[in-house]
């Protein structure tokens, strides 16, 4: 059975309102990452309870050259980073709005991720994050990553703090 967040993802995946497009564009512009360490292509939906976004692991990404060189797969640390960027940082930017500045500091405080399937070169993944709590500048979320077949690749809990100056 799909959770309410997954149902919302599948509905919103096919329809994105103009206000959502503007909101997600602003969030993406505020992300403190750039290529080659940006793992967010698009935000499908975002509200005060969670966020859904996508990223495609292009075949030319540098880490594939050495991570199981004869059968490259995406490293778990990169999958975790992708879930943190979409599921934690994008949601945090949405929640604090314009309080985030270039001087703001981001810190991952804890992760507990279970890896279930590999992610191969060229695969597009979807990250779905549900807020557990946001208090005292700490955001904790339940996150899951789905492959293009809607199979769960990995899932768990991620928490972090963004210090707003």
Give the ranges of each region predicted by the language model.
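Non-catalytic linker/capping segments at the edges of enzyme domains
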Residues: 2-73, 102-104, 120, 138-140, ...
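Hydrophobic beta-strand-centered segment that forms part of the acyl-chain substrate-binding groove
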Residues: 15, 19-21, 88-128, 153-155
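Short alpha-helical scaffold segments that flank and stabilize functional sites
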Residues: 56, 87-90, 132
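C-terminal domain-closing interface element
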Residues: 125-152
